[in-house]
Amino acid sequence: MLDTLLIDATPRWLIGQAVAFLALALCIAGFANKDDNKLLLILIAANVAFAAQFALLGSWVSAGITCIVITRIVLARRYHRNLFIMAALLAATIGVTIVGWQDWKDAPASIAGILGTVGMFAFRGSIMRWWLFVAAFFWVLSNVAIGSLGGILAESLVMTTNIITIWRIEMDKRRLALQAD
């Protein structure tokens, strides 16, 4: 990544970095919000910024999959466990990967897209968040591969937030179980 920072500091690269930090700010605003509807709207805006960032940094598979992620956020909430829609989004993710494949740097975004789709459509609660945690890890790898500082920080924030939320969900389950006894 250091070689990217030193060699690729073109105006397009700098704008890509700025857009990534905008996405980071939107992620922070989204996860700080207690209203799920506002969270989803802010996450959609963050993913629009991520798609632009990936395009500016020349990662077309990541940009395409991020556009699919935007669609997934909207559909997963309304059509949870709908296997047809999940399969269509998985096929779109694989299709974008095949059409746009440039090199190994495209693999983490593809894996992240697949894991996130399965997680959001097949699960809820802690299990869904574990899937999203692993998907975020692959988004971190994708951002490392293209040298996106804001993207690395944003996805690391997503991972940290997911771990904290998983812990809180599990603690609530334990409290409820103790109260039931």
Protein language model features and the residues they cover:
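Alpha-helical membrane-protein topology signature
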Residues: 2-181
